[in-house]
Amino acid sequence: MSLAIDLEVKQDELIVRLSGELDHHTAENCMNKCRMCLEKRAIRHIVLNLGQLTFMDSSGLGVILGRYKQIKNVGGQMVVCAVSPAVKRLFDMSGLFKIIRVEADEQFALQALGVA
């Protein structure tokens, strides 16, 4: 299966909606699209909506961690939302939830950033 990547910019927030599988086959494309958007726009925060993500492996974790570091370097925050149980388990095992905030849905994620 493939990965659909929807990027939406609201003010200085980048909303990334992923649908499908984020794995070693799709990670580089996802990383490049997000990185280019972050470099071209004055993005300060990222909301990562994983509601339609059906699978993620360690390559996907690497993409997320890389964008987290990129946004932290400009003083911003990343919030992840709508995480499925399988993906949540991977986040828990990796320890990413210790550094990245999680919210139930996109609206709550934007509110957590103070922009909704």
UniProtKB/Swiss-Prot annotation:
Q: Which SUPFAM superfamilies match?
A: SpoIIaa-like
Keyword Phosphoprotein in the entry? The reply is yes
Alphabetized GO MF terms? anti-sigma factor antagonist activity; antisigma factor binding
Any single biological process term in GO? sporulation resulting in formation of a cellular spore
- The reply to whether Phosphoprotein figures as a keyword in the UniProt entry is yes
CDD domains linked: STAS (cd06844)
InterPro entries membership: Anti-sigma_ant, Anti-sigma_F_ant, STAS_dom, STAS_dom_sf
Q: How is it modified after translation?
A: Phosphorylated by SpoIIAB on a serine residue.
Q: Which residues carry this modification: Phosphoserine?
A: 58
Q: Which PROSITE patterns match?
A: STAS
Which parts of the sequence belong to the STAS domain?
3-113
Q: Which UniProt keywords apply?
A: Phosphoprotein, Sporulation
Role, per record: In the phosphorylated form it could act as an anti-anti-sigma factor that counteracts SpoIIAB and thus releases sigma f from inhibition.
The family this protein is said to belong to: Belongs to the anti-sigma-factor antagonist family.
**Protein name, UniProt field:** Anti-sigma F factor antagonist
The organism's taxonomy opens as: Bacteria, Bacillati, Bacillota, Bacilli, Bacillales
